């Protein structure tokens, strides 16, 4: 895919989302010692108290080509920005990093500048002063400013050899809900990177949220095959690898569906694709079958029962009750096993 340059880009850049997510782990002494725990409470008057092991996953995900380039599991209380910085080593020139509002620290931006990577980061109400003012609706929609570390960070930034000043462009976009969103970016050229395109660009970040959904629901990541720390890591990396394999194997089927003239765009049904790969994976990976006929058969299966893409469909987000979630996971959730 990347070797021959035949992959999707936005503004000529490979778009990579960096994001973290909590992963529930088996409750064993080995896992507790390796990853740590997080306390929980619940019930009326919080009479239910306890703690259980978790990990913080960090993924570098190509949102346009649906491939995870790198993934790591950190401790339960790991700093998400620190984990995200570890993914920089797996990027290259011509990459654009999309990051959520958990990541807009000066160090994150400075590390991106030092590595020569472009970035777009969503600003929060607790981030840079310019972003806070723009979120309140103050000032122009586009501002280019020079950021410097605060007094508490200055010594650490200097010790790390990071730039003490970073030139950043802030772009304010209006969401369909009527709310403002402020994005901080290293893409300073307004002619080459017009402000009107940033809403579409940042919306691509939802691809990594969907990726975590596939890992945790469709592939049942948290249903681990072992109870030790090493088994947890192996399951995590095997599951991420499987998603990349699925993306590569379904590329021809996706191209065929894109070429069809239909009312709504179509895409491969991932319940079908993962099930087909599961049944044929050993023959494909172990070399027990001829690759050509096997890939043709898989493509035929991938083209069955495609799902429709309705971009204009925006159902309201709901927060289900614990009872509804338990019912879903026990009785309704579809697995690819």
Model-identified regions with their sequence ranges:
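Short, basic alpha-helical nucleic acid-contact segments in DNA-binding proteins
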Residues: 1-2
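Single, function-defining residue in the core of a domain
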Residues: 5-14, 18-337
